[in-house]
From Swiss-Prot:
Keywords tagged on the record: Activator, DNA-binding, Nucleus, Transcription, Transcription regulation
Gene label: SGF1
Protein name per the record: Silk gland factor 1
Location(s), subcellular: Nucleus
GO cellular component: nucleus
Lineage: Eukaryota, Metazoa, Ecdysozoa, Arthropoda, Hexapoda
Region (Disordered): 82-103, 212-255
Source species: Bombyx mori (Silk moth)
GO BP field: anatomical structure morphogenesis; cell differentiation
UniProt keyword Metal-binding present: no
DNA-binding region in chain numbering: 112-203
GO molecular function, one term: protein domain specific binding
Length: 349
């Protein structure tokens, strides 16, 4: 009978073992028909043995909760905390969790760039000094002590600090006095700059301060530079012989006169050669001064471009002698000058 009941896979069931007398029951079977988690040669794992031993046959019926608890207690359900240290160390999740528990997670902003402009940093340094005056090196030191970010790349941001001090009217350079010897001048805030930052917040200025005196000087220098630029252009034109105040020489006078005559008369028949007898006679007639002639009323007056007064009169006489006499501006289209140029402007058919 015992051999038949134990022949199923060599695994004793709780029903067959419970039918045995207490004296014949093996020592590893308890009184409630449960087996503790002990190694068994024909089982795959200890957990399977525990599960199989705790499951009773249909003939046994429902076990009380206390019995089930005792059975589960003996089944070998090991909690996470009692795992071996080797298995816990092998898990990457547990290693990450242990690292977070060992070190308090807190993000540090000490080495981040502060959200302040260089003007704000300089104002902070000056206002935090009792004398309200600091040298350039003291401003550097204050910024580096307050913000560790500026302990690196010192040359770059220190150049920006010097630029801000020099080109902002809110900062004033104060020379040293005999009672304060040392190197370098002091820097302070302008008395009229007022409170540039709202409620002590240095993130943004309310308005940009401008010194009226410095602004006036800047405008005057700007106007002077503009005037000097135009004066230089006039001097450059004077080098080419157009705006010279000194009277030109004989050779230059003749050359400029020929050039102006060529510009006035585009028609080839009016440009006379200078070495012909007709040209000599023409130059003699230019010396005659007409009566009642007003050069400024000529429609083609170029008095501002001519080098000398004598040449101006000669050229105006030339216009009169060749039919370019006085004609008002409104009668220009009825004058012979317009018809003459209009005839030459039309292309030949």
């Amino acid at each position: 009978m015992i051999s038949q009941k134990l022949s199923y896979g060599d695994v004793p069931t709780s029903a067959s073992l419970s039918s045995l007398s207490p004296g014949l029951a093996p020592p590893y079977v308890n009184g409630m028909g449960c087996m503790p988690a002990q190694p068994y040669p024909n089982l795959y794992s200890n957990n399977m043995v525990a599960g199989g031993s705790c499951m009773g046959s249909p003939s046994v019926g429902y076990s009380p909760p206390s019995t089930m608890a005792s059975c589960m207690g003996g089944a070998g359900a090991v909690p996470y905390g009692s795992l071996p240290r080797e298995q816990e160390a092998a898990s990457p999740t547990s290693a990450l969790q242990r690292a977070r528990n060992d070190k308090t997670y807190r993000r540090s902003y000490t080495h981040a760039k502060p959200p302040y402009s260089y003007i704000s940093l300089i104002t902070m340094a000056i206002q935090n000094n009792p004398s309200r005056m600091l040298t350039l090196s003291e401003i550097y030191q204050f910024i580096m002590d307050l913000f560790p970010f500026y302990r690196q790349n010192q040359q770059r941001w220190q150049n920006s600090i010097r630029h801000s001090l020099s080109f902002n009217d809110c900062f004033v350079k104060v020379p040293r006095t005999p009672d304060k010897p040392g190197k370098g001048s002091f820097w302070t805030l302008h008395p009229d700059s007022g409170n540039m930052f709202e409620n002590g917040c240095f993130l943004r200025r309310q308005k940009r301060f401008k010194d009226e005196k410095k602004e006036t000087l800047r405008q005057a220098q700007k106007a002077q530079q503009t005037h000097g630029h135009h004066g230089g252009s006039h001097d450059k034109r004077g080098e080419h012989g157009h705006d010279k105040s000194a009277p030109p020489g004989p050779g230059e006078d003749k050359e400029m006169r020929d050039e102006l005559l060529a510009q006035l008369h585009a028609a080839p028949e009016l440009c006379l050669p200078e070495h012909t007898p007709l040209a000599l006679e023409h130059y003699a007639q230019l010396k005659q001064e007409p009566s009642g002639y007003a050069p400024a009323q000529h429609p083609f007056s170029i008095t501002r471009l001519l080098p000398g007064a004598d040449t101006k009169a000669d050229l105006k006489m030339y216009d009169v002698n060749y039919g370019y006499g006085h004609s008002p501006a409104d009668n220009y289209y009825q004058s012979p000058l317009y018809h003459h140029h209009h005839a030459h402007a039309q292309p030949p058919l």
